[in-house]
């Protein structure tokens, strides 16, 4: 992802979420945020810290004790914040509010190989059949 500043870190039900605000990367895009959820942030990742493209900010949260039986995964969201957004008290409900953030499809900006898994995918079936 692009360089930015950590604006919020908060608990989610599997770990912690990190919100990064990125400055304009092109004049047509403007400011945007990226959210990385279900993580364990590195000790040096705190609100106000500048992060650079390629920095390791966190590891995946251990979900083995989750009552929901969810496999470890990264929840990644991308959006454009409103001009009036406040990061104080930022939680997942903030991400759902279109008056505060307009969500965008993050897949076009991921510059690494990825695979979107569907419930019927053989890898999904194999992973779900294992005890974790």
What are these regions (language model features)?
Residues 1-41, 73-75:
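Zn2+-dependent peptidoglycan hydrolase active-site motif and core
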Residues 4-6, 25, 60-64, 92-95:
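Residue-level detector of functional hotspots within protein domains
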Residues 46-52, 62, 69-132:
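Acidic, glycine-rich catalytic/binding loops that coordinate metals and/or anionic ligands
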Residues 1-7, 45-60:
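Short, well-structured beta-strand-loop connectors
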Residues 27, 33-36, 54, 85-90:
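Alpha-helical context
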Residues 2, 18, 58, 88-92:
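Generic, low-specificity signal for short hydrophobic/alpha-helical stretches with a mild N-terminal bias
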Residues 18-20, 52-67:
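Short hydrophobic beta/alpha edge segments that flank linear recognition/processing sites
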């Amino acid at each position: 992802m692009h360089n930015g500043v950590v604006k919020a870190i908060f608990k989610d039900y599997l770990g912690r979420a990190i919100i990064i605000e990125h400055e304009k990367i092109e004049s047509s895009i403007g400011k945007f945020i990226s959210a990385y959820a279900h993580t364990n942030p590195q000790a040096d990742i705190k609100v106000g810290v500048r992060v650079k493209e390629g920095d390791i900010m966190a590891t995946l949260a251990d979900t083995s004790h989750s009552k929901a039986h969810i496999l470890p995964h990264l929840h990644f969201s991308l959006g454009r914040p409103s001009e009036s957004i406040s990061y104080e008290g930022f939680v997942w409900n903030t991400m759902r509010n279109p008056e505060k953030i307009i969500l965008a499809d993050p897949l076009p900006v991921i510059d690494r190989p990825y695979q979107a898994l569907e419930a019927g995918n053989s890898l999904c079936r194999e992973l779900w059949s294992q005890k974790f």
